[in-house]
Amino acid sequence: DVNKETHEVFFTHRGKQYSVIGDKVVFAVGRAGSRVFLDWCKRNGVACTNNQVDIGVRVELPAMVWEHFSKKIYEPKILYRSKAYGDTTRMFCFNERGLVVTENTDGVLTVNGHAYKELDRKTDNSNFALLCTIRFTEPFNDPIDYARYVASLANKISGGSVLVQRLGDLESGRRTDEKRLKQSTVRPTLNAVPGDLSLCMPKRQLDNIIETLHALDKVAPGTANYDTLLYGVECKYYSARPDCVDFEIKDCPGIYALGDGAGFTRSLSQAAANGLIIGEILTKK
């Protein structure tokens, strides 16, 4: 904890509690510490803005489908505005001949993807994230818990894992079971539980995802194939951003916030640059 009046910082190390006092205090907590930072802001009356979250799936398909893009572009990124709702769905985090993997964030399992540089570790599949951005309005103001709840439903339905479903089964209103998955021409790179994503993901997000896949199919034929695999759930959180001036929290003189944990950046490189900027600000003061 941090006392905003005295700048006393309380922490625990090896089971013992300590405290230090600094002229300047910087919150650089990362995404994993965003909840701790938000709780501190609430206790100290610091206004924060954040009312959106990205929820969707990890798409896996034969590498040849997007090969004509991946040979020219390191990472294809495409934004699509759905006709049904006007929501934005984005394709990003493209991994050519990569693997679908799981992430554990505070006990909630979600999906992600990566690819190895070594040729002998390449696969026959490529994968990418396909997420729908949802912006909430008042009175709801906890998008992170909303996303965690959706992801936890997938964990519960899958018996403590994540789900995988063929696109064709999803569109036909059928659950993908072990038998159907074995019939798929796309061999999964993650040992996920075959299931039905419509039982855990909201209809609006699923509609957006299906519509986007068919739009992508027009530029990369085969994207919306019956056997295209969808893993769920994948989430990207936007941390709450405090009211600041030059990263100094309003009404908290000498206390600063930066990086992903404070909602100012969305990547390691951006967070690192943010740290350099605050370093320059502090040295000038």
Residue ranges and their predicted role:
Residues D1-K285:
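Residues forming the flavin
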